[in-house]
Amino acid sequence: MGFLSLFTKEIAIDLGTANTVILHNDKVVVDEPSIIAVERNTRRVMAVGKKALMMHGRTHENILTIRPLKDGVIADFQSTEMMLREFIKMTGTRGILFPPALKMVICIPSGITEVEERAVRDSAEQSGAKEVRLIHEPMAAAVGIGIDVLDANGNMIVDIGGGTSEIAV
């Protein structure tokens, strides 16, 4: 670990319709359902992930559970931002004296529009990212299983998610 790593943390995020997975230092540090529970009137976060899922359908009328992603893209920007912020807190990437500059790589579906792509980038930046890079989900899957994506050989990737399924060659 170098001196600069004290000031910068790099995380990779698979922001999925059903689940969100966050990696830091090649380890899965968050693997939670993509759901958030908030107070209906104040929009204060009550719970995210597994705790929010346990509340889903069993909550008091003043508590609202939200799945902020639909079909692989952001359907509720504010809820996505709050959920991401809470998941990032779970990663253990906080600094000792001040928060580190976060660099994020986020997976996106191949067929999303520029507006949907911008929503992902904005949500990450509002959640504290200083630098955001977006990568298509099939490419991330290929790199994740060790395929040399620059090699001249063809490979087929099938990515089956909760909201989208993609096949890439």
Residue ranges of each PLM-predicted region?
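Nucleotide/phosphate-binding catalytic cleft detector across ATP-hydrolyzing
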Residues: M1-G162, A168-V169
